[in-house]
UniProtKB/Swiss-Prot annotation:
Top-level taxonomy: Eukaryota, Metazoa, Chordata, Craniata, Vertebrata
Keyword Cell division (UniProt): no
GO MF terms, alphabetically ordered: DNA binding
Any GO BP: chromosome condensation
Function: Protamines substitute for histones in the chromatin of sperm during the haploid phase of spermatogenesis. They compact sperm DNA into a highly condensed, stable and inactive complex.
Species whose genome carries this gene: Oncorhynchus mykiss (Rainbow trout)
UniProt-recorded name of the protein: Protamine-1B
Entry keyword set: Chromosome, Developmental protein, Differentiation, DNA condensation, DNA-binding, Nucleosome core, Nucleus, Spermatogenesis
Tissue expr: Testis.
Coiled-coil stretches: none
Entry's localization field: Nucleus; Chromosome
């Protein structure tokens, strides 16, 4: 059971960097 909880935490960490990269791309296109 502890292994399934670790996989859930990994997906949450990967979703945070994805939002950061999308905001950086939008700022570069506006310039």
């Amino acid at each position: 059971m502890p292994r399934r909880r670790r996989a859930s935490r990994r997906i949450r960490r990967r979703r945070r960097p994805r939002v950061s990269r999308r905001r950086r791309r939008g700022g570069r296109r506006r310039r």
